[in-house]
């Protein structure tokens, strides 16, 4: 009986350690957030102090250079590109 209890406790401990060792896949994971900051998607803010545009898209700014947004490439308007 004592051996069964020890084996049971060992199994519970290993399961608990396995659950704790899983990588954090939550949306608040710092690694995912850092990766997301690598480039700005379509119609997202870009430019000075912000991320560059993904897929070499142009970063278009207003006249005051204050509101910069990633825009589509010319070829993307015709269904080309990625």
Swiss-Prot record:
It comes from the Eukaryota. Residues 22-37, 72-82 form a propeptide. GO terms for molecular function: calcium channel regulator activity; ion channel inhibitor activity; toxin activity. Keywords: Calcium channel impairing toxin, Disulfide bond, Ion channel impairing toxin, Knottin, Neurotoxin, Secreted, Signal, Toxin, Voltage-gated calcium channel impairing toxin. GO terms for cellular component: extracellular region. Expressed by the venom gland. Residues 1-21 form the signal peptide. Belongs to the neurotoxin 02 (plectoxin) family. Antagonist of L-type calcium channels (Cav1/CACNA1). Induces immediate clockwise gyration and flaccid paralysis after 6 hours at dose levels of 5 ug per mouse. This is Omega-ctenitoxin-Pn1a. It comes from Phoneutria nigriventer.
